[in-house]
A protein has these predicted regions:
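Flexible glycine/proline-enriched surface loops and loop-helix/loop-strand junctions
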Residues: 5, 141, 244-248
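Glycine- and acidic
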Residues: 9, 42-43, 189-197, 245-253
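Conserved alpha/beta catalytic core and glycan-binding cleft of carbohydrate-active enzymes
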Residues: 32, 48-50, 54-225, 229-230, ...
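Carbohydrate-interacting/catalytic domains
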Residues: 199-208, 213-386
Length: 386
């Protein structure tokens, strides 16, 4: 039962493998599908008796060698329901994109306020080179890391900041189903009923922080439909059996959360307009890590970090990102010459001041910037024509 649902196929049986290949080819030829995402894809790496040890899955090899399937996008959830975890170079599909569960959990824990997470967040923003090494033997690329915080499995983005506990009673399994460890934080109030205005505002700010970190990280960003307007499943983190308002997209929330939708849309546009963020290789010498000052504090108690990303190699602007994951207001000092920098993103501000066009922002007047608790600031320095 490696799928958790009792219907696992032995994918490396030659007849089953042929069925899978024929099905994929049919979808590409007849349905013009240009990509596939494989749930619990580590099942591919199981022997017939369920043991692990295949150096390369015959099915994955067949997909790689197929002239039709070789050109489509392949995405793996690189684990299964029985404990096999193959994130990054451990997965047999060397060119596959992979859902990065470490990114999800580390970013959740940092935004939640867990201690000891600064070093992990640095690694995730950099492109998760611990999982996707680009040495000669592995030859991975950071874009293979699918960076996400929420998906169809588990909480929505809004529920991630609105619930501490799962609320799956409607599923009929006495609230025992669904993930127990969600690394969520409700901002001081469980659910929406009676939630104070200050709690609701903090939730929006935390959701913007999640959006920021996903969009600023090297790799391939992913979010779930509805997260861009704070859709909710009312705390249900396993609504597989719900064909009702629990699992449906509530389009009224788009109307109610236009300000957040604006922020989300502009963050996507910001990423697309700055190729220095999403590279085929890691940032390497183009990035410099800082804390509130020149040196980064990676102690267990630290919740702050910053980084400068030189955009020259991509003919892009320079970026300076300041991240305050702690409760208290913090003063960050820009570790670059002051000239030319403008503040374009500040999750501590209300809309529309939370994200602005470069032309609408004044030059910085000081190297010292005060960041509210649990907020992210992004500075941009346009590149002057040569």
């Amino acid at each position: 039962n490696f799928s958790g649902t009792g219907n696992t196929l032995h994918c490396n049986n030659r007849y089953v493998s042929r069925m899978v290949l024929d099905s994929l080819r049919s979808w590409v030829q007849l349905g013009h599908v240009n990509g596939f995402r494989f749930d619990l894809a580590s099942v591919f790496n199981r022997h017939v008796d369920g043991s692990v040890g295949l150096e390369d899955s015959p099915l994955v090899s067949a997909i790689r060698a197929d002239p039709l399937l070789g050109g489509v996008r392949l995405i793996a959830e690189p684990w299964d329901a029985a404990g096999l975890y193959q994130l990054g170079s451990a997965f047999p599909g060397k060119r596959w994109f992979q859902w990065n569960g470490k990114f999800r959990d580390d970013i959740r824990r940092f935004v939640k306020g867990d201690q000891g997470m600064v070093a992990a967040v640095m690694c995730r923003l950099y492109g998760s080179d611990d999982a996707f090494p680009d040495d000669l033997f592995n030859a991975c690329h950071p874009y293979q890391s699918v960076n996400y915080v929420n998906s169809h499995d588990g909480y929505t983005l809004y529920d991630q900041v609105a619930y501490n506990e799962r609320h799956n009673w409607a599923n009929g399994e006495e609230n025992r189903d669904g993930h127990r460890d969600n690394f969520s934080w409700n901002c001081g109030w469980e659910g929406d009923v009676g939630a104070p205005a200050a709690v609701l505002r903090l939730r929006r700010q935390q959701a913007k922080n999640f959006c920021c970190l996903v969009m600023l990280a090297n790799g391939t960003p992913m979010f779930c439909a509805g997260d861009e307007f704070l859709n909710t499943q009312f705390g249900n983190n396993n609504p597989y059996c719900q064909d009702n308002e629990i699992s449906w997209l509530d389009w009224q929330r788009l109307e109610d959360n236009r300000d957040f939708h604006r922020f989300f849309s502009k963050m996507i546009a910001f990423r697309k307009s700055h190729p220095t963020l999403a590279r085929s290789r890691f940032w390497r010498e183009d990035v410099r890590w800082h804390g509130t000052g020149a040196d980064i504090d990676m102690s267990f108690e630290s919740h702050q970090l910053a980084f400068y990303l030189d955009g020259a190699a991509e003919n892009d602007a320079d970026l300076y990102v300041m991240i305050n994951g702690g409760w208290q207001q913090q003063t960050f000092t820009l570790q670059q010459p002051l000239s030319g920098w403008r503040r374009v993103i500040d999750t501590g501000r209300d809309s529309p001041g939370d994200i602005l066009e470069l032309a609408d922002t004044p030059p910085l007047a000081s190297k010292e910037l005060s960041l509210d608790g649990r907020s992210i600031v992004v500075l941009v320095r346009p590149r002057r024509p040569a």
